[in-house]
From Swiss-Prot:
Database matches in HAMAP family: UPF0149
Domain of life, per lineage: Bacteria
InterPro entries linked to this entry: YgfB-like (IPR011978), YgfB-like_sf (IPR036255)
Similarity-based family: Belongs to the UPF0149 family.
Family annotation (Pfam families): UPF0149
Entry's Gene Ontology cellular component terms: cytosol
UniProt-listed SUPFAM superfamilies: YgfB-like (SSF101327)
Name of protein: UPF0149 protein XF_2010
Disulfide bonds: none
Organism of origin: Xylella fastidiosa (strain 9a5c)
């Protein structure tokens, strides 16, 4: 049995998405889901309809790859050992494909985060800076980089780690900071 915190494989997420008739890539789906959860939203069965902005999309069936993706992502974000991981491209993908997947993931994350946090108070100064940095990555493309495999591979891994930690910081900001839900008085 897979660990509840283990993300499904990219290809499995892609295949199930296609079988459901969804025109979304695995990195885009995971980025949107991660943004929604990091911003404090998506705690119900309608998370998929929310991130796809389509009320007609059914919730993933119990035990499905997409339901496991949701459960693993939510568990990773809450893990005290900071286990959160990005679902990007397959291990054998080219550097350009990995970079494209990361930039696509960032664009989707911002959309999901906006869905969750749109009506909440402002983030901390650090949270605002992180969002600006993620927005810059979301606007990037592989054409912006000299794709020297050895040098750029290390740089891409550093950027992936930055994004991973940025998501955890934004999630923490929304849990304990100004965008956390406030009690009504």
């Amino acid at each position: 049995m897979e660990s509840p915190m283990h993300l499904p494989e990219v290809i499995a997420v892609q295949q199930e998405s296609q079988q459901m008739g969804l025109s979304v890539t695995a990195p885009e789906l995971h980025g949107s889901l991660s943004g929604l959860l990091a911003g404090g939203g998506g705690n119900g069965p309608d998370w998929l309809a929310m991130i796809l902005a389509d009320a007609e999309v059914a919730a993933p069936p119990k035990g499905s790859v997409l339901e496991r993706l949701y459960q693993a992502t939510a568990s990773q974000l809450e893990d005290p050992d900071f286990a959160f991981q990005l679902l990007l491209a397959d291990d054998g993908a080219t550097l350009a494909a990995r970079a494209d997947a990361l930039f696509e993931w960032c664009r989707a994350f911002l959309g999901g985060f906006g869905l969750a946090a749109h009506s909440r108070s402002v983030l901390s100064a650090e949270g605002d800076e992180i969002l600006r940095d993620l927005a810059k990555l979301a606007q990037a493309s592989v054409d912006d980089f000299d794709m020297n495999e050895e040098e750029e591979d290390g740089s891409l891994e550093e950027i992936e780690e930055f994004v991973r930690v940025a998501v955890l910081l934004l999630h923490g900001d929304c849990l304990i900071g100004p965008c956390a839900p406030q009690p009504l008085n």
